[in-house]
Amino acid sequence: MVKEEKQENRGSVEFQVFSFTNKIRRLASHLELHKKDFSSERGLRRLLGKRQRLLAYLAKKNRVRYKKLISQLDIREK
């Protein structure tokens, strides 16, 4: 029963990138309304950096998983 509830691996690179992408999109829409919210902008930049480092790691380790992930999340390749 516990294994059924925990289908996704929350520690996987894909799940972490997915989570960061959701947070980034939410913060970006917030910043469109609140242009002078500089602390949220700083948080957005930190999340972008974390996601970029994870994607670089995944690209180095497994290029196929990397390509599949960026196509699913509609992220530009750097």
Swiss-Prot record:
InterPro entries: Ribosomal_uS15, Ribosomal_uS15_bac-type, uS15_NS1_RNA-bd_sf. The lineage of its organism: Eukaryota, Viridiplantae, Streptophyta, Embryophyta, Tracheophyta. Belongs to the universal ribosomal protein uS15 family. This is Small ribosomal subunit protein uS15c. The keyword Secreted does not apply. NCBIfam families: S15_bact. Keywords: Chloroplast, Plastid, Ribonucleoprotein, Ribosomal protein. The keyword Plastid applies. Part of the 30S ribosomal subunit. GO terms for molecular function: structural constituent of ribosome. It is found in: Plastid, Chloroplast. GO terms for biological process: translation. PANTHER family: RIBOSOMAL PROTEIN S15, BACTERIAL AND ORGANELLAR, SMALL RIBOSOMAL SUBUNIT PROTEIN US15M. Its main location: plastid. One of its GO terms (cellular component) is chloroplast.
